[in-house]
């Protein structure tokens, strides 16, 4: 029997929502490291006016407040059973609930933070989102939901890099070798995205209609 493989580390990637290209790539040697280890990297990367779509690995009030202090905004999903206080109701209808809330306990790790809780009804299910953009005129409820749905593009990017381009399997166990394969694979991914975009333009089709696998 072949020996059981070992996890080589953990990578963090920021993807541009429009271009689908990686903005930054980080590697941590500890495969069990928490996502919060990438928070300093993100804080150093983002510029004022940026809107981040965050998964629940970055569900951290102190980090959110640090982003807001840098004039960077976010959209994420609220955790089930999360505690909050309603400060203002913008909309409360059959299909939309949009409220200004306060979360946190006032401690260093969980400071008080003011956010919008946007809830969109789909048949009998409510989908709940948090955003630091507190003005509904700037970011209406349905735009919040639509933008967060596009966060799935990061999952698609990881799937392409790991499965189609082979990053699930490493050539070497050395850290330098792993990093070389990591950067090389993402570089190839960027070329594939750029080429697929050119194919979409040539065929006058939306990018989503183009098969990256067929282009590859």
Segments from the language model and where they lie:
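Single, function-defining residue in the core of a domain
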Residues: 2-216
